[in-house]
Amino acid sequence: MKRIEIFTDGACSGNPGPGGWGAILRYNGTEKELYGGEADTTNNRMELTAAIEALEALKEPCEVDLHTDSNYLRDGISGWIEGWKRNGWRTADRKPVKNAELWQALDEARRRHKVHWHWVRGHAGHPENERADALARAGMAPFKKKKGGDTASSEEGSARRR
């Protein structure tokens, strides 16, 4: 089984507001960069989307070391998700899980891989995290307001680049 390193990040301007996600996939010295964005989203949604897109980009089952600066992502996938599934996608206090459709997509995306989740401190000089952040900002850029108040966006309000 191939061993892949993935570094992900999400960014949002306004939270909610325009946002982007970025991911670096590294295998055997080769890197692939992915990024995309949405017109109206949150930072947490972009963090989840980065991980989903990165895992879905893998063409075969892999052993993955996924690095994120998001405690929300790491804690959710490493601990909370099993309880949410048992509770019908409700929290311990019976409220609907926020971003449930993304958590479900992430749960599905990770199934064919053996994923090790790693937390890194964001904006602390970690080179791959800084690059993933730059990719997330690039994904967000088309949706940020331009001078004159217009918002640049695609027809669907989201964009992905691979």
UniProtKB/Swiss-Prot annotation:
<dbReference type="GO" id="GO:0043137">
    <property type="term" value="P:DNA replication, removal of RNA primer"/>
</dbReference>
<feature type="binding site">
    <location>
        <position position="47"/>
    </location>
    <ligand>
        <name>Mg(2+) 1</name>
    </ligand>
</feature>
<keyword id="KW-0963">Cytoplasm</keyword>
<dbReference type="InterPro" id="IPR022892">
    <property type="entry name" value="RNaseHI"/>
</dbReference>
<keyword id="KW-0460">Magnesium</keyword>
<dbReference type="GO" id="GO:0004523">
    <property type="term" value="F:RNA-DNA hybrid ribonuclease activity"/>
</dbReference>
<comment type="similarity">
    <text>Belongs to the RNase H family.</text>
</comment>
<feature type="binding site">
    <location>
        <position position="9"/>
    </location>
    <ligand>
        <name>Mg(2+) 1</name>
    </ligand>
</feature>
<dbReference type="InterPro" id="IPR036397">
    <property type="entry name" value="RNaseH_sf"/>
</dbReference>
<feature type="binding site">
    <location>
        <position position="133"/>
    </location>
    <ligand>
        <name>Mg(2+) 2</name>
    </ligand>
</feature>
<feature type="binding site">
    <location>
        <position position="9"/>
    </location>
    <ligand>
        <name>Mg(2+) 2</name>
    </ligand>
</feature>
<keyword id="KW-0479">Metal-binding</keyword>
<keyword id="KW-0540">Nuclease</keyword>
<comment type="subunit">
    <text>Monomer.</text>
</comment>
<feature type="binding site">
    <location>
        <position position="69"/>
    </location>
    <ligand>
        <name>Mg(2+) 1</name>
    </ligand>
</feature>
<dbReference type="InterPro" id="IPR002156">
    <property type="entry name" value="RNaseH_domain"/>
</dbReference>
<keyword id="KW-0378">Hydrolase</keyword>
<feature type="domain" description="RNase H type-1">
    <location>
        <begin position="1"/>
        <end position="141"/>
    </location>
</feature>
<dbReference type="Pfam" id="PF00075">
    <property type="entry name" value="RNase_H"/>
</dbReference>
<feature type="region of interest" description="Disordered">
    <location>
        <begin position="139"/>
        <end position="162"/>
    </location>
</feature>
<keyword id="KW-0255">Endonuclease</keyword>
<dbReference type="GO" id="GO:0000287">
    <property type="term" value="F:magnesium ion binding"/>
</dbReference>
<dbReference type="InterPro" id="IPR050092">
    <property type="entry name" value="RNase_H"/>
</dbReference>
<dbReference type="GO" id="GO:0005737">
    <property type="term" value="C:cytoplasm"/>
</dbReference>
<dbReference type="InterPro" id="IPR012337">
    <property type="entry name" value="RNaseH-like_sf"/>
</dbReference>
<dbReference type="GO" id="GO:0003676">
    <property type="term" value="F:nucleic acid binding"/>
</dbReference>
<protein>
    <recommendedName>
        <fullName>Ribonuclease H</fullName>
        <ecNumber>3.1.26.4</ecNumber>
    </recommendedName>
</protein>
<comment type="function">
    <text>Endonuclease that specifically degrades the RNA of RNA-DNA hybrids.</text>
</comment>
